[in-house]
A protein has these predicted regions:
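A short alpha/beta connector and helix-capping loop motif
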Residues: 86, 96, 265-286
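A short, acidic, amphipathic alpha-helical segment used as a generic capping/interface helix at domain edges
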Residues: 147, 322-335
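Active-site flanking residues adjacent to catalytic metal/cofactor-binding acidic residues
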Residues: 164, 256-259, 285, 344
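Thiamine diphosphate
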Residues: 1-241, 246-251, 320, 355-374
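Residue-level marker for buried hydrophobic side chains located in beta-strands
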Residues: 207, 253-256, 283
Length: 374
């Protein structure tokens, strides 16, 4: 019998009691409480992955080492798992347990980018040979189903997935941590940094914005026909921008990227560098967190994005923290032409009243195409 939403600690401890761990994955707000619990109570057992396919591969390695890993992912990233699930886990018979959130669940309101994947999530898992069922919200029933999942994985050597609907896991209340001492002047908020970027760049610049709150803040404060708001498809904005730039050689192009998004598709920087003569200003807003899914940490704190861009062949790289340096870097990049990276260190957090996009995604794309054609 249902008892309401599961407590995150209850879910984590049930998984651990059944021998599961380590945990790895990419955040979704539906499973944010689970990640918060792992980070607070079992940090050595949680590995932040850059994308869902990497998480499955990490889990496969854990299986080879004798563990029973759990992969955490949003169903919008399920496509990233297709190759490692079908050609690694299935082929080598390496069973991993998946917790897949159910955004876009049919009959439930959600954002347009989740509609198709929400409709096909169960069928997609089934077609990949991944037995799946909806996560029970009753602890006793969940314990029974974990036994079933373990039996299936042990017998077949194949993965098993629990699909996690919205609200299935209750918020996790962690003990308040002491605030970290400030290191230097306060960083800009993302909306402030976006404002400095837009005001510094050529007004005719074609600007592609990554998914989540970056695109939403750009639309709210600086909407114009030359903006494209990429919803979903996390990590793809820089490649979209390069595709635009390669095919509009007479236009200036820029992309507002994020640290989590850049890490998810880090290979895009190699392709941009290979085409470093193409006019593309890559603006990487780095707050060291997945802000749009609840502020879970990314792995960006230890990543030298400027060094990577330089090694990939970008014409110049900048690592900035203040408004003056940011504006100067944008102006310099657009004056010099070619591919340039500007990493912008920003503070975490955003406006709690930030609304959803006003412009439907197809309308945004159509308007952007018209702006290019003019």
């Amino acid at each position: 019998m249902s008892t309401g939403a599961l407590q995150a600690r209850t879910l984590v401890e049930l998984l651990r009691e059944h021998g599961h761990g380590p945990f790895t994955g990419v955040p979704c707000s539906f499973l944010g409480p689970v990640i918060s619990c792992l980070e607070a109570e079992h940090p050595q057992e949680y590995v932040i992955a850059a994308n869902e396919g990497e998480a499955v591969a990490l889990a496969a390695g854990a299986v080879l080492a004798g563990r029973r890993p759990v992969v955490i992912l949003q169903n919008s990233g399920l496509g990233n798992t297709v190759n490692p699930l079908t050609s690694l886990c299935h082929t080598l018979r390496l069973p991993v347990l998946l917790l897949v959130t159910w955004r876009g669940r049919p009959g439930r309101p959600d954002e347009p980018q989740h509609e198709l994947m929400g409709r096909i999530t169960q069928d997609m898992l089934t077609s990949m040979g991944v037995r799946n069922e909806v996560l029970p919200d009753d602890p006793a029933l969940l314990a029974e189903r974990l036994d079933v999942a373990a039996g299936h994985m042990d017998t077949t050597g194949l993965p098993f997935a629990f699909i996690v609907p919205k609200g299935a896991v209750a918020p996790y209340e962690a003990a308040a941590a002491a605030p970290a001492p400030a290191a230097g002047p306060p960083l800009m908020k993302r909306a402030e940094a976006i404002g400095h970027i837009v005001s510094a760049m050529d007004p005719d610049t074609l600007l592609v914005a990554t998914t989540g709150k970056t695109a939403r803040e750009l639309e709210r404060d600086w909407d114009r026909p030359q903006n494209l708001y990429v919803v979903g498809s996390m990590g793809c904005a820089s490649s979209v921008a390069l595709g635009v730039a390669l095919n509009t050689p007479d236009r200036r192009v820029a992309v507002l990227d994020g640290d989590g998004a850049a890490l998810m598709r880090l290979e895009a920087m190699a392709t941009i560098g290979r085409h470093s003569g193409t006019d593309l200003c890559h603006l990487l807003l780095d707050n060291e967190s997945y802000e749009s899914t609840g502020g879970q940490p990314t792995a960006s704190a230890g990543v030298d994005f400027a060094g990577i861009a330089a090694a990939c062949g970008y014409r110049s790289t900048h690592d900035v923290r203040d408004a003056d340096a940011l504006r100067a870097a944008v102006l310099r990049a657009q004056q010099d032409g070619g591919a340039h990276l500007v990493r912008v260190r920003i503070a975490p957090g955003s406006d709690p009243n930030l609304g959803r996009p006003a412009l439907a995604p197809p309308a945004s794309a159509a308007r952007f195409k018209e702006a290019i054609a003019r």
